[in-house]
Curated annotation (Swiss-Prot):
SUPFAM superfamilies: Homeodomain-like. Residues 211-270 bind DNA. Residues 185-199 have a biased composition (Basic and acidic residues). Disulfide bonds: none annotated. It is found in: Nucleus. This is Homeobox protein Hox-A11a. The lineage of its organism: Eukaryota, Metazoa, Chordata, Craniata, Vertebrata.
Length: 283
């Protein structure tokens, strides 16, 4: 780089960085042009095009756009899209048909063919699909009428299985809501027909199947009175037992068996409580 002294002639009013510069008190600088207004030239300015400020370019190019000339008006586009109701119906129908096809298509080719036919039909006639779909709902209330055969088959098998698998009454204990006197009377009749020494184990019927006696459930009133008596005395004497049987319309044997079962239940509860408290020393 050339020395500054060789390029610029040093004048009396020139400032040199290496020299101390003193300004006299009476110097007048009003005639000199300002530094900001003085034109400055650069050696590389002719090689580059004139660049405008970014803000001006943005405003001129985007704020003054002729929308009608640059972007053509598309209008309502009736040829591309149908009405909103048809679009929603078509999407829902295609999703529903796809789900049904996944459900039935693996095991039944006829179901898959029916689902495809129904799907294709609704896509070709989208204008009438919105009215026909809601009017042609099948028996199940969800799927169209094409799936009534599967609905009938499924529920027919369910009804048949329930009828064939239904218990006969002597294998599984039943509990039907009825009044306490009727239950007690039926139990009393059963007890009267049975011998006293009959065991509670199931018996073998004539055809070789194991049968069981009809279970006589106790009513809430009977259980409440029996629990009250059990609270006062765990073991009941014969006199009190006969009195309870007459008051609750039960047999003497029923009252005796209930007290036996209740004592076993109480013993089990006490054993469980003892085990619980011994396993938790903090209690």
């Amino acid at each position: 780089m050339m020395d500054f002294d060789e390029r610029v002639p040093v004048g009396s009013n020139m400032y040199l960085p290496s020299c101390t510069y003193y300004v006299s008190a009476g110097a007048d600088f009003s005639g000199l042009p300002s530094f900001s207004t003085r034109p400055m030239t650069y050696s590389y300015s002719s090689n580059l095009p004139q660049v405008q400020p970014v803000r001006e370019v943005t405003f001129r190019d985007y704020a003054a756009i002729d929308a009608s000339g640059k972007w053509p008006h598309r209008g309502n586009l009736p040829q591309c899209y149908t009405s909103a109701e048809d679009m929603v119906h078509r999407d829902c129908l295609s999703a529903q048909t796809a789900v049904v096809g996944d459900m039935f298509g693996k095991n039944s080719p006829a179901a898959a063919a029916a689902a495809y036919h129904h799907h294709h039909h609704h896509h070709t006639s989208a204008s009438s699909a919105a009215t026909n779909f809601y009017g042609n709902v099948g028996r199940n209330g969800v799927l169209p009428q094409a799936f009534d055969q599967f609905y009938d088959t499924a529920y027919g098998n369910a009804s048949e299985s329930s009828s064939t698998n239904g218990f006969s009454g002597d294998k599984t204990p039943t509990k039907q809501p009825s009044s306490a006197p009727e239950d007690a009377q039926a139990c009393r009749d059963t007890e009267a027909k049975e011998p006293r020494e009959e065991s509670s184990s199931p018996e073998l019927s004539s055809d070789g199947q194991r049968t069981r006696k009809k279970r006589c459930p106790y009513s809430k009133y009977q259980i409440r009175e029996l629990e009250r008596e059990f609270f006062f005395s765990v073991y009941i004497n014969k006199e009190k037992r006969m009195q309870l049987s007459r008051m609750l319309n039960l047999t003497d044997r029923q009252v005796k068996i209930w007290f036996q079962n209740r004592r076993m239940k109480e013993k089990k509860l006490n054993r469980d409580r003892l085990q619980y408290y011994t396993s938790n020393p903090l209690l």
